[in-house]
Amino acid sequence: MKAKKLLATWTAVSPTTLPEVAQQIWSLLTPQAFVAVEGEMGAGKTTTIAALIQKAQIEHFEGSPTFAIVQAYHSPVKDKIYHLDCYRIENEAELINLGLEELFDESAYFFVEWSEKIKQILPFQHFWLYIRTNPDLSRTLELYHDH
C-alpha cells in the first residue's frame, strides 16, 4: 500500500473562501496531476472542482459530468483539464468501453469524483483531496500525495 503525505489542510471553507483555497490547491499540484476528489454525497466535490476549473481561467463550468462521465476543458494557463464523475460506473467492462486507461495517458490534469469506482486503473502516483462537512456546514479539505 502506498503511503500518503499530507500536503495541506483547510478548515472552515465556505463558498466565499473556496476560490482562494482553489488557488492554493493549484500551487501544490504537479504538472499533469491526477486528483482523486473524495467526500460523501453532497460534500461539495463538484463545487470544489468548479472552483479549481475557474481558477484555471475557464469561464464556463459545465457541471458534473454524471451522465457523460468525462468533461474536457481547455485552459489558457493549464492546458487540458478533465473532470470525471465515475459514480455511474458499475464494472470493469465499462472502464474498458470508456477508454479511461488510454485517457489517463494524456498529458492533462484530471479531477475525478468517485475514484474508488476506478481504483484498478488509477495512476501509480496521484493526489487525494478529501472533503468533509463540518457541523457548521463549512468544509474541511485535506490534500494528500501518494509517494
Model-based region annotation:
Residues 38-40:
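P-loop (Walker A) phosphate-binding loop of NTP-binding proteins
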Residues 58-73:
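Short beta-strand-centered segment that lines the nucleotide-binding/catalytic pocket of NTP-utilizing
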Residues 3-11, 57, 93, 101-147:
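Short phosphate-coordinating micro-motif centered on Lys-Gly-acidic
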Residues 2-24:
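N-terminal pre-Walker A segment at the start of P-loop NTPase domains
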Residues 26-32:
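Phosphate-binding P-loop
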Residues 45:
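Conserved lysine of the Walker
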Residues 34-36:
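Short hydrophobic/aromatic beta-strand immediately N-terminal to the Walker A/P-loop
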